[in-house]
Amino acid sequence: MPSVAIAGAGLVGALNACFFAQKGWDVSVYEFRKDIRTMKHVQGRSINLALSQRGKSALEAVGLKEYIVNQGVPLYARLIHNKDGKTYSRQPYGKPGEHIVSINRRHLNEVMITQAEKSPNVKFFFEHKVKNVDYDKKQLVVQCTSQPSKIPTFGNKSPPQEHAEFHVEADLILACDGAYSAVRRSLMTIPRFDFSQEYIEHGYVELNIMANNNEFAFEENVFHLWPRGHFTLIALANRDKTFTVTIFAPFSEFEKHMSTSEDVLSFFEENFPDAFLLLGKEHIADTFNRVKPQPLVSIKCSPHSFFDNLVLMGDAAHAMVPFYGQGMNCGFEDCLVFSETLEEYGNDIAKAVKVYSDGRVNDAHSINDLAMYNYEELKDLVNKSSYKLRKKFDTIMNSIFPKSWIPLYSMVTFSRIPYSEVIERRKRQDKILSRIMTTTSTLALIGAAAGIYVNRGKLGL
């Protein structure tokens, strides 16, 4: 059977292992961390994940959708918390019943690793760091960072010694090693490989609201949002009745208003009074004493495939800011689209990797841009009357033209319409709306002029 070597056992790497296990391929996965299933605490991001249609479709293809969805908390709307801490407004995500699912990142990752390992042809190699790619041999260069271990027979004559580097040969290489991908970095000298990286001015800090007498402290089936202009607080429910709370703010804001315990407590009490009471002074102060704000990066690159057997996927190809909840969903859709492409081309790897990259780059760039736009919506626009009017207009148009007029959020979240097509559809909607507004304004102006003419005598004109 064909063989695939996967760099990274995170969300996208683990899901790819599940896909290729189904296909019967020989699968080897190399991960620099220890097995997270054996660890008490896992370093790295823990922002809760919002599973939507694209991610669900990928999980369904490997038989995990139902189980994973049942492990999460459904969210049907945004709940906007006003600054007084007492009043709220609710914005449903889509049509009645449409929802996203709040999922714990670590649990999801563990489930997929365990699922993939059920296949005898799948091997995970933890504490094995992918260093780079050997261009000439089209192989991964891996370093064993702990004790020697058995390495798959393809391309290796003997197990490596501790800290020794070795080459991994496979018919297909999938780089799923994250935003700071070692594989992608080693490809940077290849001519015509385009790459861009942007750190936004905002960072984030995570906190937790504990269960209240074994009950949720807030309403659980909504996405809690405290939009305050240039900074924002969000909260998502977990199955254990806790909430993961995240504050996004410019680094300058963290330095100015959250650098001491006294300052951060005053800041939270003033801007998020209801959350402040549930988080508690001690937890807020302790968290900000221990944790520094983490950066947020947006990465684009093109192409996503190299040679005739290597593909970049997930954050290695398109790291994005988390404000559309599509980082995981896009990465999972990468796995699904590539699997579908391989099947379409009869497992012709060389053809499949090129076709995949040609089609996926534009989609990845598109959702990257949409994620940046959605932060403007989350931190400010949701409270503006123009945004609310547009949302109502989209809802009305969708009820009249359900197939041809789909709201932007619904296209991204509740469909598998390619991201690039989503943007084109939105542009057409904007043009139509602009014409309607122009026509309406013109008619209103003509009507006003006619009224003035009829009443010119009374008006002394």
UniProtKB/Swiss-Prot annotation:
Pathway: Cofactor biosynthesis; NAD(+) biosynthesis; quinolinate from L-kynurenine: step 1/3. Its cofactor is FAD. Disulfide bonds: none annotated. One of its GO terms (molecular function) is kynurenine 3-monooxygenase activity. It is an enzyme of class 1 (oxidoreductase). GO terms for biological process: 'de novo' NAD biosynthetic process from L-tryptophan; anthranilate metabolic process; kynurenine metabolic process; L-tryptophan catabolic process; NAD metabolic process; quinolinate biosynthetic process. Pfam families: FAD_binding_3. One of its GO terms (cellular component) is mitochondrial outer membrane. It is found in: Mitochondrion; Membrane. It comes from the Eukaryota. Its EC number is 1.14.13.9. It catalyses: L-kynurenine + NADPH + O2 + H(+) = 3-hydroxy-L-kynurenine + NADP(+) + H2O. The chain crosses the membrane at residues 395-415, 432-452. It is a multi-pass membrane protein. Catalyzes the hydroxylation of L-kynurenine (L-Kyn) to form 3-hydroxy-L-kynurenine (L-3OHKyn). Required for synthesis of quinolinic acid. This is Kynurenine 3-monooxygenase. The gene is kmo-1.
